[in-house]
Swiss-Prot record:
Its EC number is 1.5.1.5, 3.5.4.9. NADP(+) binds at residues 164-166, 189. GO terms for molecular function: methenyltetrahydrofolate cyclohydrolase activity; methylenetetrahydrofolate dehydrogenase (NADP+) activity. Pathway: One-carbon metabolism; tetrahydrofolate interconversion. This is Bifunctional protein FolD 2. Homodimer. Belongs to the tetrahydrofolate dehydrogenase/cyclohydrolase family. Keywords: Amino-acid biosynthesis, Histidine biosynthesis, Hydrolase, Methionine biosynthesis, Multifunctional enzyme, NADP, One-carbon metabolism, Oxidoreductase, Purine biosynthesis. One of its GO terms (biological process) is tetrahydrofolate interconversion. GO terms for cellular component: cytosol.
Length: 282
């Protein structure tokens, strides 16, 4: 391993830049405001929400938290989102996932106004990514791009394998990397001979949630490895990549924890500020 792609340093830089940017907006009478909706009482969600709220407070974003009971109907939730869409004091809206089974996440993504879409999951914003026209990008995707840019990883012409096809990471990531002239292959649970794809990859990005999915024999010498997976095994947090075995072969690799993770909430706050600026013609 020649380079460890740690995310804490670039995340701190984003936070410091946001503090200054938000101070300037507030001096012009603009107060970035993010509404975060929680449905139910998922323990993991509460931890993540606390991190979001703490960072919002630190950088100067006004965070409005709305909590709905677990038995809330989809119609009730969507009606509230529609109200927030019309509220000019709200710049960004996000719903903490997962939501209870009676609520379809796709209906949420379709209802949040694209101009207030803090998560970047609305169909219109995702479609714009394929046209290279959107600066509204899902937070995890923005985090990966930040690492690529911060560490000067060249993507043009690189054979890039993305493992995972979710609308949250895999698909939008493919769109933005194609715009950067990467040659992108998306692999998934039905992909045959995954190792044949990864052995020829200059860059491997995994977001599956399966420990030890990417092993040393699947990676060529000098590849760049970005691990987005989050798994817990024997009380230890780890990614999709067998880090100890793969790292010696890699040109650069993210640790888990400490790689993409530290950037995700900072990226979400950055998106809230981008939305605020766009709404005020900045």
């Amino acid at each position: 391993m020649k380079k460890l792609l740690e995310g804490k340093t670039p995340a701190n830089e984003i936070k410091e830049n946001l503090i200054e940017e938000i101070k300037k907006l507030k001096s012009d009478g603009i107060n970035p405001t993010l509404c975060v909706i929680e449905v139910g009482d998922d323990p993991a969600s509460k931890i993540y929400l606390r991190v979001k709220r703490n960072l919002a407070k630190k950088v100067g974003i006004k965070e409005i938290g709305l909590h709905f009971p677990a038995n809330t109907s989809q119609a009730e939730l969507l009606e509230k989102i529609e109200d927030l869409n019309q509220d000019p004091s709200i710049n960004g809206i996000m719903v903490q996932l997962p939501v209870p089974p009676q609520i379809d996440p796709r209906a949420i993504f379709e209802t949040i106004a694209p101009e207030k879409d803090a998560d970047g999951f609305s169909p219109l914003n995702l479609g714009r990514l394929w046209e290279g026209q959107s600066d509204v990008i899902p937070a995890t995707v923005r985090s990966i791009l930040t690492l690529i840019d911060y560490y000067g990883i060249e993507m043009a012409g690189k054979n890039t394998v993305i493992i995972g096809r979710s609308v949250i990471v895999g698909k939008p990531l493919a769109a933005v990397l194609v715009e950067r002239d990467a040659t992108v292959t998306i692999a998934h649970s039905k992909t045959k001979n995954l190792s044949e794809l990864t052995k020829n990859a200059d860059v491997i990005i995994s977001d599956v949630g399966k420990a030890h999915l990417v092993t040393e024999d699947m990676v060529k010498e000098g590849a760049v490895i970005i691990d987005v997976g989050m798994n817990r095994e024997n009380g230890k947090l780890m990614g999709d990549v067998d880090f100890d075995m793969v790292a010696p072969k890699a040109k650069a690799i993210t640790p888990v924890p400490g790689g993409v993770g530290p950037l995700t909430v900072a990226s979400l706050m950055k998106q809230a500020v981008i939305l605020t600026r766009k709404q005020h013609g900045r």
